[in-house]
Each structure stands twice: as C-alpha cells, then as structure tokens.
Amino acid sequence: MAQPSIGQRIVVDVPSTTANLGPGFDCLGAALDLNNRFAMRRIEGDSGRFELIIEGNEGSHLRGGPNNLIYRAAQRVWKAAGLEPVGLEAKVRLAVPPARGLGSSASAIVAGLVGANALVGEPLSKEKLLELAIDIEGHPDNVVPSLLGGLCLTAKAASQRWRVVRCVWINSVKAVVAIPSIRLSTSEARRAMPKDIPISDAVENLGALTLLLQGLRTGNGDLITDGMHDRLHEPYRWPLIKGGLDVRDAALNAGAWGCAISGAGPSVLALCPEDKGQAVSQAMVKAWEAEGVASRAPLLSIQSGGSHWQPQIEDE
C-alpha cells in the first residue's frame, strides 16, 4: 500500500493472545479472534508528541506521552529505519482491559511497530518487526502470535537467533477464556516464581508440551488433557488468582479437556470441543460469581492472520 500522508489515519488490528497454555512457559502462545483496534495518524509539531485517545471503558487509565508503550515501539521503528521521529496520535479500542493475561502490552508493542512502519512507507520487513517486538517485550510468547497469528512456538537457537515454528491448531479445538474484573500484573506474577526449579519438573514440562502440541494438531482431547499440565509457573501463580482453582475445576467438570492460566493471569483458558463451549463458559462465570468476581467467558477460535493495517474509511 502507498505511504499514508500526514494526517491520514490508518487502522491497525491486533489480536489478543494467550500465552504458555500450561507447559509452554515463555515460548508458546496463540492469537485469539478477539481483536484490539488502533487508529493511528502522524501529526504535525513536536517529534516527541504522542496523543492517546481511548474509546470505551477498557484501558481508560492509560495515558499518552513519550513513555507510552505504543510510542516507544514506534520510535524503535523510525530509529531502525534511519528516520527522524514524528508526532503520533492513536485512537485505541481494546477488546479486553490490560493486566488480564491476554497480551495487552504485546498488543500495544505490535500496534506501535506495525502502525509506525506503515505510516512511513513500510521500510522494515516483518522479520525485523518481530525482532524489535521480542526485544521490547523481553520474551516472545505473546508478541510473536500477536504479530504473526496462529499458534507459535518461539525459541532462541544456539546461534542466538530467534526461531519461530508455526504449529497446527486444528479448528475443532475451541478456547474459552474466562476474563475476570480483577487485575494481576505480569511483574507480580513473575515475582511469585522461584529462581530455581527441580530438574524433574523441567522434564515433566517437556513431556507435557510435546503431548499438548500433538493434541492441538490432531484434536485428540486425551492428549490435550495429559499435556495441559505445568510444574514451572502455575503452582506459584494459582494462589494469586482469587477463585482461580475453582474456575479451573468448574471448567473441567463441565467438559473441558484442559485448563491453564492465560499468560500471567488472572484470565483462565479452557480448551474444549465446540459442543461443550457454552457449558464450560457458563460454569467458569458461575464459579467466579460465587467468589464475588464478575467475569465473561467468550468461546473463541484461533486467529490465523495476525496483525494487519489498512487505511481508515472516513466514517469508520
């Protein structure tokens, strides 16, 4: 597409993501068909100027300014392309609020990268944007599927290059994500984890991850059940989520194959066949309701296209 002119607005759609899926700590993530939308345009004036407009109640506490994550990501694009920074405005509509374990920071980073790149004629390749996204976020599990879509396994090779494997997630496996009104910061969730783990726990996770990936590829519910277990992070994070274990148990009792903390939490991910989706959703919401926590639990598919941009239609 042609480079948008100053003042012309573009729309960047970025999927929410669920990371870890139990045993895939910091390396496995999937894009969900629950998109965040960022309408962006270059503005005249101070090159460090960033204006943020939030539509709706989700993310109403977020602020603009040069330290905003969207603008920091945008600056990395311009620096990598050898360009001077420009002023930027972003009008944001979030599908879910931040600090819920659904990749809100990754979404902001990817929106900033994709949007800034588009606004200056796309000088950077998607591979370069991916490299910048991982560097800004510090771990790949959310930003990679947020940019590329689908189910992604990302690891740093011996060469120190990031390697991304696009894994198969068969369409018959659906995701129910219970999203509560409570918040949990990623930093708090990471502080709860020990610095060292027993080698037996690491071995168990490796086996579980293999089973989970095969279950997602084939739709084998038994493999998903056996694979969706974790020893590295979930034992230390479940106690941080009010009612979380009750929500997990309710999902399993309603027919889910497996259940995990979504990202750092507090949202809870359940995998199930489509015909069990409504029952699993209702059970999870009811379990949180018993703890005095409001929630919603949409039945979702995997979003395979990743992030993309287009010129904004005038009346959109």
Curated annotation (Swiss-Prot):
Residue positions binding ATP: P97, P98, A99, R100, G101, L102, G103, S104, S105, A106, S107
Coarse class of the protein's main subcellular location: cytoplasm
Organism domain of life: Bacteria
GO terms under biological process: threonine biosynthetic process
Involved pathway(s): Amino-acid biosynthesis; L-threonine biosynthesis; L-threonine from L-aspartate: step 4/5
Class of this enzyme: transferase
Keywords attached to this entry: Amino-acid biosynthesis, ATP-binding, Cytoplasm, Kinase, Nucleotide-binding, Threonine biosynthesis, Transferase
Pfam families cross-referenced by the UniProt entry: GHMP_kinases_C, GHMP_kinases_N
Signal peptide: none
InterPro entries: GHMP_kinase_C_dom, GHMP_kinase_C_sf, GHMP_kinase_N_dom, GHMP_knse_ATP-bd_CS, Homoserine_kinase, Ribosomal_Su5_D2-typ_SF, Ribsml_uS5_D2-typ_fold_subgr
Function: Catalyzes the ATP-dependent phosphorylation of L-homoserine to L-homoserine phosphate.
Protein's name in the database: Homoserine kinase
Species this chain originates from: Prochlorococcus marinus (strain MIT 9313)
Organism ancestry: Bacteria, Bacillati, Cyanobacteriota, Cyanophyceae, Synechococcales
